[in-house]
């Protein structure tokens, strides 16, 4: 009886440690986990449209990263800053599909914003929370995201 309790307790501890920390066990190798989503930085330079297409080919449900909070931006910066130094990365926000309304490529509502001008396609600095509009034909690095 004592062994059963010990083994059961041990399994419970392992389960809670994996599920409680978001240890990334749901994300494929090379992807990082945050709040139930998987993220990956790609160093290739691409146009916005090519970057979105590239992300959709990386994993089912994947798109250019959508940023829903300041905390999520901090997480993405923690990934991009060491890899890309002072670079710019495409995010999944543009008005390329609808001339007057900004939309995330994954269909999420635009709740969190970090720029002041009406953009065409949006890049984020790899080292801070600033967003900039850029012509969609320019090339930048890529961050992809999907729900785990």
From Swiss-Prot:
Origin species: Crotalus durissus terrificus (South American rattlesnake)
One Pfam family named in its UniProt record: Lectin_C
Name of the featured protein: Snaclec crotocetin
Signal peptide coordinates: 1-23
InterPro entries: C-type_lectin-like, C-type_lectin-like/link_sf, C-type_lectin/snaclec_domain, C-type_lectin_CS, CTDL_fold
More about this protein: Shows greater sequence similarity to the beta than alpha subunits compared to other heterodimer snaclecs.
Alphabetical UniProt keywords: Disulfide bond, Hemostasis impairing toxin, Secreted, Signal, Toxin
Main localization of the protein described in the UniProt heading: secreted
Subcellular localization, as worded in the UniProt entry: Secreted
Lineage: Eukaryota, Metazoa, Chordata, Craniata, Vertebrata
Function (record text): Interferes with one step of hemostasis (modulation of platelet aggregation, or coagulation cascade, for example).
PANTHER family: MANNOSE, PHOSPHOLIPASE, LECTIN RECEPTOR RELATED
């Amino acid at each position: 009886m004592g062994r059963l309790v010990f083994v059961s307790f041990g399994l419970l501890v392992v389960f809670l440690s994996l599920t409680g920390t978001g240890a990334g066990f749901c994300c494929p190798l090379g992807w990082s986990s945050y709040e139930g989503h998987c993220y990956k930085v790609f160093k290739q330079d691409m146009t916005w449209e090519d970057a979105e297409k590239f992300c959709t080919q990386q994993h089912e449900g994947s798109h250019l990263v959508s940023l829903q909070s300041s905390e999520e931006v901090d997480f993405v910066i923690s990934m991009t800053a060491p890899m890309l130094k002072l670079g710019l990365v495409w995010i999944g926000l543009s008005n390329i599909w609808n001339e007057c309304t900004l939309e995330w490529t994954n269909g999420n509502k635009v709740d969190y914003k970090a720029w002041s001008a009406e953009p065409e396609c949006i890049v984020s600095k790899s080292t801070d929370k600033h967003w900039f509009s850029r012509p969609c034909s320019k090339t930048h690095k890529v961050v992809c995201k999907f729900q785990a």
